[in-house]
Amino acid sequence: MAVIKRALISVSDKTGIVEFARELAGYGVEILSTGGTAALLRQEGLAVKDVSEYTGFPEMLDGRVKTLHPKVHGGLLGMRENPAHVAKMKEHGIEPIDMVVVNLYPFEATVAKPDCTLEDAIENIDIGGPTMLRSAAKNNRDVTVVVDHVDYDQVLAEMKGSGGAVSRGTNFKLAVKVYQHTAAYDGAISNWLGQRMGDELADFSDTLTVQFKKVQDMRYGENPHQKAAFYVERDVQEASISTSRQLQGKELSYNNIADTDAALECVKQFNEGPACVIVKHANPCGVALGSNLLEAYNRAFSTDSESAFGGIIAFNRELDGTTAQAIVERQFVEVIIAPAVSAEAIDVVATKKNVRLLECGYWPQEPGARYDFKRVNGGLLVQDADLLLSGDIKPVTKRVPTEEEMRDLLFTWRVAKFVKSNAIVYGKDGMTIGVGAGQMSRVNSARIAGIKAELAGLEVPGSVMASDAFFPFRDGLDNAAKAGIKAVIQPGGSIRDEEVIAAADEHGIAMVFTGMRHFRH
């Protein structure tokens, strides 16, 4: 453990840097700096030596060359306990640099701007910063390297307790963080530039680098014999399971997280009023709109109260005390998630200490584009997330849906998007009547939806039906007619569409095509 005597500070994100540098100066640390960081520290009354003065070589090429100099990197890489290194440093007038505080040009923030040009992106690729970070991290036995302002307090606390020194254990952890950071930084550059190698912007780069941060080790995975952990993206913006805050309850399990994600992403589809989604094994078993949250929950629960036992409940409005009371009195629930939770609701759910209560924040009505990943043995499938609802919805039958039927068709269509294929959803008056999920036969999914409705004591006649993919034969419409379905929404696109349309016309069923399939595997 060596005392910090000299620090090089050069940061783009200046959060907390003045206070940190002032503390370093209090330990007698000499501060080297560049450009805007040096100007800020001087403005705040701190003594700073420019790196150009230290190296005897000016900044040049519009600031592209500032710290790329042997006096900087020799001072970082020279091993203090290696006599040959020490002798060579003395021979060339190289002084040790004991600490590097550097964060990088904001490449990702720059390329996220709609008007970003290739030239803008190139100028925000940091060269000197990563080079210093990697040099310091390599020699972490002797050099403390700080890439994240959240680590300032930890470093200062250690210096306070050890006379201005930082332990090798802490240096090693900080060095690992540097390599993780620079790997992600280079990955972002590689991904962005890789899409621009041809004459046109490519949807996918030839290589893909992704980095996630571990936030939780889990007791086990999908099954008790599997180990598991939860990782999140480095910069999650939209409200999601990954941004949620747990207010109470047991630790989230692997299955809890997967199911809560399914429930929350489904309920995000409904902006027109209070909505509730109940999920079991990643499938919606009850979805409903209501005049208030309690009504939405009651209606969703009534769809399939048996499957709702031990389920996940998601809302699109602040969870209130009355709705929370209805839940805890009525059913066993694993997780409740909402954009906000009232103080009264927190008190109510606290009576069931094991229930996991999550608050995720509100989301925009128009979700941002993102990728979906699916791991296969030896590879990774990457696709655009299925964020679009439909193409051009058009009636294809003699009878056109009524306004009320059209509302229910669009409601069930949004639900079907989140049901495992083959998916059939029956709905009426803004609630699901029956859900048929995950069957190899579309007709069997329809049968299951009918069975679910019957078990729940709900009437299918007069309902509408949504199918996540086209009907390959007319039997789907024949069975729908027998069940009393009055209107159908489906993508269309079968070679037997005319036969299916004819069947709908024979039964007086109104049918619309969306032109967009929503398989979910």
Swiss-Prot record:
It catalyses: (6R)-10-formyltetrahydrofolate + 5-amino-1-(5-phospho-beta-D-ribosyl)imidazole-4-carboxamide = 5-formamido-1-(5-phospho-D-ribosyl)imidazole-4-carboxamide + (6S)-5,6,7,8-tetrahydrofolate; IMP + H2O = 5-formamido-1-(5-phospho-D-ribosyl)imidazole-4-carboxamide. It comes from the Bacteria. One of its GO terms (biological process) is 'de novo' IMP biosynthetic process. Pathway: Purine metabolism; IMP biosynthesis via de novo pathway; 5-formamido-1-(5-phospho-D-ribosyl)imidazole-4-carboxamide from 5-amino-1-(5-phospho-D-ribosyl)imidazole-4-carboxamide (10-formyl THF route): step 1/1; Purine metabolism; IMP biosynthesis via de novo pathway; IMP from 5-formamido-1-(5-phospho-D-ribosyl)imidazole-4-carboxamide: step 1/1. Transmembrane segments: none annotated. InterPro entries: AICAR_Tfase_dup_dom_sf, Cytidine_deaminase-like, MGS-like_dom, MGS-like_dom_sf, PurH-like. PROSITE patterns: MGS. SUPFAM superfamilies: Cytidine deaminase-like (SSF53927), Methylglyoxal synthase-like (SSF52335). The keyword Transferase applies. One of its GO terms (molecular function) is IMP cyclohydrolase activity. Residues 1-147 form the MGS-like domain. Its EC number is 2.1.2.3, 3.5.4.10. One of its GO terms (cellular component) is cytosol. Keywords: Hydrolase, Multifunctional enzyme, Purine biosynthesis, Transferase. The keyword ATP-binding does not apply. PANTHER family: BIFUNCTIONAL PURINE BIOSYNTHESIS PROTEIN ATIC, BIFUNCTIONAL PURINE BIOSYNTHESIS PROTEIN PURH. The IMP cyclohydrolase activity resides in the N-terminal region. Belongs to the PurH family. This is Bifunctional purine biosynthesis protein PurH. It comes from Syntrophotalea carbinolica (strain DSM 2380 / NBRC 103641 / GraBd1). The gene is purH.
